[in-house]
Amino acid sequence: MKEIVIATKNAGKVREFAALFAKRGVEVKSLLDFPDAPDVAETGSTFAENAVLKAEAASRRLKRPVIADDSGLVVDALGGRPGVHSARYAGEDKNDARNIAKLLRELDGVPMEQRTARFHCALAVAIPGRPTAVVEATCDGYIAEAPRGEGGFGYDPVFYLPERGKTMAELAPEEKNQISHRAKALTKLDEQWEEIVGGKGRTE
C-alpha cells in the first residue's frame, strides 16, 4: 500500500496519522485532496458505527483505502451523554464553549467522585475488497467543575486527569499525545496494521 486517505479535513488529525505512516512509506492524504468525497450523515448509535459509515462511504467513492475516526465524550452521570453527539451537544454549529457550558450545567451539584467520564475513539479502516477493521480506545478521567487550561480543543478544558493533577487542556502537546484516546487507538492500529492490510478485519 502506497497511499491512504484520512476521512477528515482537520489538519491536526492528518499530522497524527502522517507520523504513524511515514515509517511505513505510506503517503497520507485527506479529504481536502478529494473535493468530490461524500459528506456522510453520522447516523450510527456508536462511535464505531459512525467511523465505519464514514470510512466505507469514502472508500467506495474514492476507490482507495480510507481511515475514518469518530470520537467523543462519555459521562457516566449523564447516562453516557454527550456520546456520539459530543461535537454538536449544544446545537448544530460545533461550538466548544457552548458544549462545555451545557455539560457543566447538567452536572451542577454532582460531586466530583460521581463525575467519571472517558474520551472514546474508534478508528475504521476500509480497504476495497477487504473486511472493514475497527480499533477502539479510551482515556479515563473526571469532569472538572470549571474549565482550566488553554491547550487542546473540544472538552479538553474540563476533562480532569487525577493522576496528573491537570485537565487535558493543561497538558503539553507531547504529553497529551502519549495518553489521549486517539493516541491509544493509533497505537492499536499500528500494532494490528499487518493483520488489517492482510484482510483479517476485526473489531475491538
Swiss-Prot record:
Record-linked InterPro entries: dITP/XTP_pyrophosphatase (IPR020922), ITPase-like_fam (IPR029001), RdgB/HAM1 (IPR002637)
Binding-site positions, substrate: 8-13, 71, 153-156, 176, 181-182
Annotated active site residues, numbered on this chain, are 70
* Pfam families referenced in this protein's UniProt entry, alphabetically: Ham1p_like
Q: Which cofactor does it need?
A: Mg(2+)
Family matches, as CDD domains: HAM1
Q: What is its EC number?
A: 3.6.1.66
Q: Keywords assigned by UniProt?
A: Hydrolase, Magnesium, Metal-binding, Nucleotide metabolism, Nucleotide-binding
Q: How is the cofactor bound?
A: Binds 1 Mg(2+) ion per subunit.
Is Ribosomal protein given among the entry's keywords?
no
Biological process terms from the Gene Ontology for this record are: nucleotide metabolic process; purine nucleoside triphosphate catabolic process
Q: Which reaction does it catalyse?
A: XTP + H2O = XMP + diphosphate + H(+); dITP + H2O = dIMP + diphosphate + H(+); ITP + H2O = IMP + diphosphate + H(+)
Q: Share what the entry says about its subunit structure, partners included.
A: Homodimer.
Q: What does this protein do?
A: Pyrophosphatase that catalyzes the hydrolysis of nucleoside triphosphates to their monophosphate derivatives, with a high preference for the non-canonical purine nucleotides XTP (xanthosine triphosphate), dITP (deoxyinosine triphosphate) and ITP. Seems to function as a house-cleaning enzyme that removes non-canonical purine nucleotides from the nucleotide pool, thus preventing their incorporation into DNA/RNA and avoiding chromosomal lesions.
Could you identify this protein by its name?
dITP/XTP pyrophosphatase
Q: Name the source organism.
A: Geobacillus kaustophilus (strain HTA426)
